[in-house]
Amino acid sequence: MKTLLAKPIVLSPSQLIASGRQRACYHHPEREDLCVKVHHADRDDKETIREIKYYKRIYRNKSSSETISDYYGTQETNMGTGYVFQLIKDKTGAVSNTLDYFFKNKNYFLKHQKNMRIAYDIFKKTIFKDAIVTMALKPYNIVYQLGYKPHGQFVIIDNLGSANLIPVDYFSSTLARTTLSRRFADFERRIYNEYHIKLANMQIQTR
């Protein structure tokens, strides 16, 4: 991996996976299991640096979690510094879709809702067990990986870490889990309000 990251790469529009307010995500041109996140020219990398510090803390403690995508390091690109992450894919090889995609495509959601309900319960329990620190849980920052284990898997791909000057959640699993309780309450409320889906049992609510 060190040898790979030491070599500059060229990213092209055809490799674009998604683009947000802060940065864009591209397929890695040499590794199909990786993606490269690059900040837009008018944005700084403050949020990403915060996130990377949290990843380094996790790895320094020799711990990880199957609920978050892996981080591998930086690599120079023609668009500036790239941050290289695991690219979450379905068993078919397709890039896994975000929860936002599933919830906006109701027929697709209905097809998978039974397994998604089970996978969500496992996701929630695992995050609490691992005391993962996240700024917020958002439907476009979580993907549902089809074909993983019997019921698929939810994975956070963005917005990890804490923006607090003193990130106390890093030092106390109890405090981290207290924060997670609020994060999940906000997340489930948001899903209900925006998509009319009660995430606790994954049923679409009619108006």
Where are these regions (language model features)?
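Active-site ExK catalytic segment of metal-dependent nucleases
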Residues: C35-A41, Q86-I88, D158-L160
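A short, low-complexity linker immediately N-terminal to eukaryotic Hanks-type protein kinase catalytic domains
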Residues: M1-P13
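Catalytic-loop Lys-Pro-X-Asn motif of eukaryotic-like protein kinases
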Residues: L137-Y144
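Conserved structural core of kinase catalytic domains
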Residues: S65-N115
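ATP-binding glycine-rich loop module of kinase domains
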Residues: V10-N61, F171-A176
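C-lobe/activation-segment region of protein kinase-like
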Residues: N105-N115, A119-D121, T126-I132, Y144-R207
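Conserved hydrophobic "DFG−1" position in protein kinase catalytic cores
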Residues: H27-H28, V38, G73, L87, ...
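A short catalytic or substrate-binding loop motif that flags glycine-/basic-rich loops and adjacent residues
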Residues: I17-G20, S64-S65, E76-T77, A136
